[in-house]
Amino acid sequence: LSCDEVWQCLKDELPEARGWRCLTDERRNLIRTFWGEANKIARNLDGKPMDMDGFRSYLRYIAQNCRWMLEDRPDQKSGKTWRRMKFDKFLTEKLYIEVREGDRDDR
């Protein structure tokens, strides 16, 4: 697994997201941990481990169907603004499974 390739993929597929300026050891560990968790989920859902094509598909799905994650939007209740998500958030097991199951689509 190339952490640099994953980082480049995030930049390519989700240019509107709040990105990273530097790939630190902590972020490399985040990528490796996410990849292991996502592999298990992909095997369960797709019958095969996640590869870069599968990761790109996940990010493209977000770009097309989960626009709210990539936009700053006002919060009607608090009057504050929800900020678009950072790359870190897209690399969590919880978000990955929710996106794969369609629970995070725009409504």
What annotation goes with each model-predicted range?
Residues L1-R107:
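Append "and, occasionally, other polyanion-binding protein interfaces
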